[in-house]
């Protein structure tokens, strides 16, 4: 949808590390995971994305061994771990709260897991310091958690999780407690660390920006089911249904009715009361209801010189907001629908000199739209 966006690409030729087959889980008689199949590949950064209550954290806890499945099987590196206790799974989890021991130093927190595994004493110091160097905290080794910022505490939790070299690292909403600026910084650091370590990361979040920024692959969930599984670009550019479309980013959904098919790719349709050509890659019939999906950055507003020859949707500029690099225009269509248009700002372009209440046409480049069937009238 729109221009090609340089989002993370899924690594190719990866071998499976974790396989979930026929997973079912109930709580208090309520089925929260009805039937789930998922493969997680070696070395990838996979994000489970979805709203609260969609089952993403339950899936994470099942992989970690913190919950037991009611039916189904969990494989780790071709070994059945369905009934293996959490402490024997070679899987570590970083929680939202970090759960650092307040009475221990940073060094002691990171060393705790190694001591529990009875790692030889001579190995502990070099391994702890190596883990702290990876998260740029080697000079903080003797500090206590209360002497650290939120971002530093989060890094300590990650160092503690990776020091014993797990096969898999699970992160449950582990950035959500940070402020916006620090969260953005940690997104980049976390992805860089994952690449450096080569450990498979499974990250749980409800934040679509986090998912798009860090992931090799996103698994979009709703009601315990997978709605879409793909690269960030797949999810953003080619959403499979209206749920994914509405969740992943701000988007406009225009109602359309098929008039006729023009050729293999294009359909003539009535879109919000105006005839337009749209690209439709599935069979349609005259009169069929569709949804045309376009993001604010895919749209352009143009002055109307002749109403009879104007192309696109017609409306009136109601608001104009300067955002530095972009200019956002709120246009009210003739049918009352409000549409946000976001364009790169160019003060030398006379087309940007719109006045409030000016009559304008909204257009887009053909094929930038995503068209879905109306799910209520299939």
Curated annotation (Swiss-Prot):
Q: Is the keyword Transmembrane helix assigned to this protein?
A: no
What top-tier enzyme class does this entry carry? translocase
Q: Which CDD domains does this entry report, sorted A to Z?
A: ABC_PotA_N (cd03300)
Which subcellular locations apply to this protein? Cell inner membrane
Which InterPro entries does the protein's record reference? AAA+_ATPase, ABC_SmlMolc_Importer, ABC_transporter-like_ATP-bd, ABC_transporter-like_CS, Mo/tungstate-bd_C_term_dom, P-loop_NTPase, PotA-like, PotA_ATP-bd
Q: What is its EC number?
A: 7.6.2.11
Catalytic activities: ATP + H2O + polyamine-[polyamine-binding protein]Side 1 = ADP + phosphate + polyamineSide 2 + [polyamine-binding protein]Side 1
Q: Which domain of life is it from?
A: Bacteria
What GO molecular function terms would the record report? ABC-type putrescine transporter activity; ATP binding; ATP hydrolysis activity
Q: Which Pfam families match?
A: ABC_tran, TOBE_2
Q: Where does ATP bind?
A: 50-57
Record-stated family? Belongs to the ABC transporter superfamily. Spermidine/putrescine importer (TC 3.A.1.11.1) family.
Function (record text)? Part of the ABC transporter complex PotABCD involved in spermidine/putrescine import. Responsible for energy coupling to the transport system.
Its recorded name reads Spermidine/putrescine import ATP-binding protein PotA
